[in-house]
Amino acid sequence: MDWQSVSAFAKLFFAVQFLSIAALAQMPALSPLPGTGSLSQPTNSTQFIFVLAGDNRPAHSSDPQSAVPGNIFCAVQRMNPPAAVVLWTGDTISGKDPQHPKRMHDQYKEFLGIATRAGVPVFNAPGNHEMDDSTETPSKVMKDLYRKYMAGTYGAFSYGNTRFIALDSENEPSGAAKSVTTAEGQAKVQAPGAITKTQLKLLKDDLEANKSMAHVIIFMHHPVKAYEKKDGLDEASKKTLEDLFASYKNVSYVISGHEHMYFNSQGPKDLFTPPPARADPAQPPTYLVSGGGGAPLKSNTPGSFFHYLVFTVNGNQITPSLIKVPEINNCTQ
């Protein structure tokens, strides 16, 4: 018997097994929302545009969607050069009603009918209105309805030189979560956003597997760096994510919703300063809140206006633009 050949075969076998396990350990593939199209191959892998917005849910469960999300998706459809994809930071519906699945279906159907106006694939990171019940408690029924009518609750996809990762922040927080105080001064013990250990493990494996990508874009609902602490992730998730993202220099932007406003925690606290361009991978990622997609705006804050963000990728640089959106319907579709 040729033991040298057996040894070489064994090494090859275990190497293949290891690579297969590593591939499986990455985040699951994230699908575009139904009816918004499939992801195509880029004509230029280092030069393209993507759009981000979120938080469009109506003020009340009986209200229709406002004109704002339709205006955003129509603006995307008119872009020249065209956008490759749209990222959404959740709260697509009023939701929070697991007792009435037909009502949830109808709300998703209404939103998806609007999202198709973009003409490009739309990817969503679900929020508390898709995933929780009326007591702000994560609901298995709501999560199952989301998977049935929308997509997976977390996952990733690659486009050109960029990896896009959606996280599901609607999970029970760790026991370390403390009481927080609302802006109105009322103490409450309410579960903030949290990331499960399963997601964190897959996220780390995915970042490790995609170190060669020029950029990684993280999008989710609850902010890592919120305008108000009560709106963010629980401290355990927040610290874990910040430490993890700091270890991977290609993590360019971490963008969340939930707060109905625009907020750049590292930038000036004014109305219209767009996010900074990303060119130096030695710098930490930029943390943003973009929740101006049509839901009732946060009151008495400088960034409370309807908007979306346009990111222009050009090799190792990304340049964002901040676009205000009118409340009156200007979509001709």
Model-derived segments and spans:
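Short, solvent-exposed aromatic-acidic interface loops
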Residues: S321-T332
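Active-site glycine-centered loops adjacent to acidic/histidine catalytic or metal-binding residues
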Residues: D55, G90-D91, G127-N128, H221, ...
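Short acidic, glycine-rich surface-loop motifs adjacent to enzyme active sites
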Residues: W88-T89, I93, N210-E228
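N-terminal active-site segment of His-dependent metallophosphoesterases
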Residues: Q26-K102, Y227
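Bacterial N-terminal signal peptides
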Residues: K11-A23
